[in-house]
């Protein structure tokens, strides 16, 4: 196993950080890696907002539901779908009309590009010995976050990433069996997939039991049900439209 794959497969979310700052050279390398990642049509539909100001990080922590590691770690990156640059290129610099943000494709493209960027930043940071944890809860209060970071129209906050020096490395969390994720030639039949999920539920229950000293035995199915039994961010469409993503087509 080469060093790149070794680093990738050793990933774990870190929720406890020292107060040691992240060097600017390291941040520059992480962002350079992000910019080198692929994007749809080379449109580069991602903007990264780097936040290091303590008061601003504290506010983001509150908006994300009270996640102290955002406030504790020295760096927070916000990944945004960004069609503002495209709007400038098409309508301000040239005589074109931007239509893409009137359809769902713009949301899909922006989300995919932002996901690639976040994954790349995670891999780059961890290759430098830093710890990370992604923050999806930035979508919980998007209006306040948009105002706090002065995001213009056609820009939407999708996910965040905490970066810092780990104070404690948590145990590596088990993943679904590879057969459940990597299907050969055609999609796996439902019976086999169900069997893999059942086995994984047992593994996750054992992991949680050990991690919490017997206080919790919640499995994977129960964990995702706590989110997917409801529309936990029901205002997303409204906020997308307010930011210029009409999602009509």
Swiss-Prot record:
Family listed: Belongs to the flavin oxidoreductase frp family.
Positions with a binding annotation for FMN: 11-15, 67, 134-136, 173-175
InterPro entries reported in the protein's UniProt record: Flavin_OxRdtase_Frp (IPR016446), Nitroreductase (IPR029479), Nitroreductase-like (IPR000415)
GO molecular function, one term: FMN reductase (NADPH) activity
Enzyme class: oxidoreductase
Keyword Protein biosynthesis in annotation: no
Membrane-crossing segments per the record: none
Assigned EC number: 1.5.1.39
Protein name in the entry: FMN reductase [NAD(P)H]
Gene behind this protein: nfrA2
Regulation: induction: Strongly induced by stress due to exposure to 6-brom-2-vinyl-chroman-4-on (chromanon) and less strongly induced after exposure to 2-methylhydroquinone (2-MHQ) or catechol stress.
Subunit architecture: Homodimer.
Pfam family, one: Nitroreductase
GO biological process per UniProt: catabolic process; response to toxic substance
Reactions this protein catalyses: FMNH2 + NADP(+) = FMN + NADPH + 2 H(+); FMNH2 + NAD(+) = FMN + NADH + 2 H(+)
Note: Catalysis proceeds by a classical ping-pong bi-bi reaction mechanism. The reduction of nitro-organic compounds and inorganic chromate occur in the absence of external FMN and are therefore believed to require binding of these substrates in the active site. In contrast to these reduction processes, azo dyes are reduced only in the presence of external FMN, indicating that azo dye reduction occurs outside the active site of the enzyme.
Function as written in the Swiss-Prot or TrEMBL entry: Reduces FMNH(2) to FMN, with NADH or NADPH as reductant. It also reduces nitroaromatic compounds, quinones, chromates and azo dyes. It could supply the reduced form of FMN to luciferase-like protein and contribute to the degradation of aromatic compounds.
């Amino acid at each position: 196993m080469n060093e790149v794959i070794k680093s990738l497969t050793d990933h774990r979310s870190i929720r406890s950080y020292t107060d040691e700052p992240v060097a600017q050279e390291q941040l520059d390398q992480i962002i350079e890696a992000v910019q080198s990642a692929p994007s749809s049509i080379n449109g580069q539909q991602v903007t990264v907002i780097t936040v290091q100001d303590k008061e601003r990080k504290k506010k983001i922590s509150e908006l994300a539901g009270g996640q102290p590691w955002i406030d504790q770690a020295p760096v927070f990156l916000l990944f945004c779908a960004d069609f503002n640059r495209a709007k400038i290129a098409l309508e301000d610099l040239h005589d074109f009309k931007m239509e893409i943000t009137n359809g769902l494709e713009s949301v899909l493209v922006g989300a995919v590009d932002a996901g690639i960027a976040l994954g790349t930043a995670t891999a780059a940071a961890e290759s430098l010995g830093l710890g990370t944890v992604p923050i999806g809860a930035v979508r919980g209060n998007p209006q306040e976050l948009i105002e706090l970071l002065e995001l213009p129209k056609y820009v939407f906050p999708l996910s965040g990433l905490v970066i810092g020096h780990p104070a404690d490395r948590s145990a590596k969390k088990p993943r679904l069996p590879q057969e459940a994720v990597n299907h050969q030639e055609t999609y796996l039949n439902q019976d086999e997939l169900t069997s893999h999920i059942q086995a994984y539920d047992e593994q996750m229950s054992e992991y949680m039991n050990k991690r919490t000293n017997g206080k919790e035995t919640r499995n994977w199915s129960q964990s995702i049900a706590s989110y997917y039994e409801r529309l936990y961010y029901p205002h997303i469409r409204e906020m997308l439209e307010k930011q210029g993503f009409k999602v009509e087509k």
